[in-house]
Structure formats: structure tokens, C-alpha cells
Amino acid sequence: MSDYLVKGMAGEFIRFTGVSSRQTVEEARKRHNLSRLATAALGRALTATIILASDLKNPGDLLTLRIFGDGPLGGIVCSAGNDGMVRGYLFNPEVELPLNDANKLDVGRGIGKGHLYVTKDLGLKEPYTGTVQLVSGEIAEDVAYYLYYSEQRPNVFNLGVLVNPDGSVAQAGGCLIEILPGAPEEIISTLEQNLGEQQSLTYQLQQGKHIEEIIQEVVNPYKTEIYVKKPVGFLCSCSREKLLPHLIGLYSEVKDEEIVEAVCHFCREKYTFSGKEIKEYKEKNT
């Protein structure tokens, strides 16, 4: 099944967004040649970015998630619009660490201490950026903390990436469950109890459950109503035309017959330009 996103309500006071993202994360892994640890970290961030960007209202709006830590992975940058397409990269994609005490990939140690930034470009004069300190570096907790303290949105945020021994992605997904203002205390208690009884997100996906089924179990006995379902994936907006302006600084350094190679940070796509092409562009546009 292709990757997809669902959004909906459960009763009057629970709003949810869920994403199944295995193919998206696998595409990122292959493009960036990620280690197992880096796959888990970037995969969680890509999934979180899809979820956060799904609340954008207009086609041209853009959300960028940046995570900068002092751990060996360095940092992560991801961006997405409300169309479900995401792109992203990680500073040090080859880093690997020993498993943590729970025998899992140690994303928290890989990211370390630092800050999380969410920037929303809504076509206004200036983009809006909110920031919080990292809580754990595990990404889900950090995004949940951001939503609660920067946007006053009480929530449960769950992200998971299961990586095979050969490095390929077995499962990936995430869900955001929000408690709306005015919710009775018993709703919160019910969610807490249900969450405490659940297996991990990736375990349930590996057992064949769909993300909407997992969400239904979390919000039970409140019945879910899905009002959005759409495909998601890894897609970069880079092009030769967009990269060429960044090369005009080489104007005086390259000869006409020289070939310059440019690589997109977000997707590792390679583009080649001749010195003559760079010079002609500069002369026409400066």
C-alpha cells in the first residue's frame, strides 16, 4: 500500500492526524545513503513534518522543521506543504551508535541537546518561527512539547521507524492526537489508559494494522470520523533553474568549457552546468 495521511475527529473533543510513511522514509534512506540510526532520525522528522504541514491552509504555504543538537547526527532539516509531499536531509548521515538500554536505535543520543524550530511561510511579509529546547532528542516528545508550549495545543505525538538489519525500512508512521478546549477530564483519562495498553506504533504496523486502526484503538470508545485521506511521499522541488542562480559566484573562476556539478542538499539530485552557461546567466540577470 502506498503511503498516506488521514485526518479526522473522534467525538467532539479529539482531533487526529495519522501518517503511514514507510516508502517515504525508504526513499530518503536510499537518496541520502543513511545509516540505520540516521534512517530512524530523519524518518521520524519527515513524518512529523508531513503531519505538521497538513494543517497549512493554502497550496503555496510551506512548513520547515529544523532540529539542531550537539549529538553526532548534528541536525535535521525537513520541509513540506499541505500536499503531503516532503523533503529533508540530515547533517551527518553516516553516524551509527550502539543501541540504547531498551535495545533500540539511540536517536536521542544521536541528536543530543539543542533546539527545535518550526517555521511557517504563509506568504506574508515574514515567515513565523517558533522554537523550543529539545526535551529528549527523540523527536516525537520534542514536537509534542513544541505544540503544547508554542501553539497551546495539548496533544499526544507518536512517531516510529522500524529499520531492518540490512538498513532498509520495515515500517514507519506517526500520529498526532489533540485534545480540544473544553474536553472533559474523563476523555484525557481514557486516552492515557488506552495509550498505556498499546504496543509500539511500529510493532502494530508490522502486524498489519493500518494507521487509522491504531488511532481508533487509542481513542476508543469514541468513534473516529475521517474527513481527509490523501497520498504522501518524498518529493523535492529542486531543479536546474532553481540551482543556477546560486552558482553565479563562480562567474570569475570557471572557464567556458569547465563543468560544474551542484548537488541538492534535500534530495542529493545532481545537476551539471557548463562555465559558459553560468556566465551567460549572470550577464543576463545582473
UniProtKB/Swiss-Prot annotation:
Disulfide bonds join C236-C238, C264-C267. InterPro entries: Heat_shock_Hsp33, Heat_shock_Hsp33_C, Heat_shock_Hsp33_N. SUPFAM superfamilies: Hsp33 domain, HSP33 redox switch-like. GO terms for molecular function: protein folding chaperone; unfolded protein binding. It holds the Pfam family HSP33. Keywords: Chaperone, Cytoplasm, Disulfide bond, Redox-active center, Zinc. It is found in: Cytoplasm. Under oxidizing conditions two disulfide bonds are formed involving the reactive cysteines. Under reducing conditions zinc is bound to the reactive cysteines and the protein is inactive. One of its GO terms (cellular component) is cytoplasm. GO terms for biological process: protein refolding. PANTHER family: 33 KDA CHAPERONIN (PTHR30111:SF1). Belongs to the HSP33 family. Redox regulated molecular chaperone. Protects both thermally unfolding and oxidatively damaged proteins from irreversible aggregation. Plays an important role in the bacterial defense system toward oxidative stress. This is 33 kDa chaperonin. It comes from Carboxydothermus hydrogenoformans (strain ATCC BAA-161 / DSM 6008 / Z-2901). The lineage of its organism: Bacteria, Bacillati, Bacillota, Clostridia, Thermoanaerobacterales.
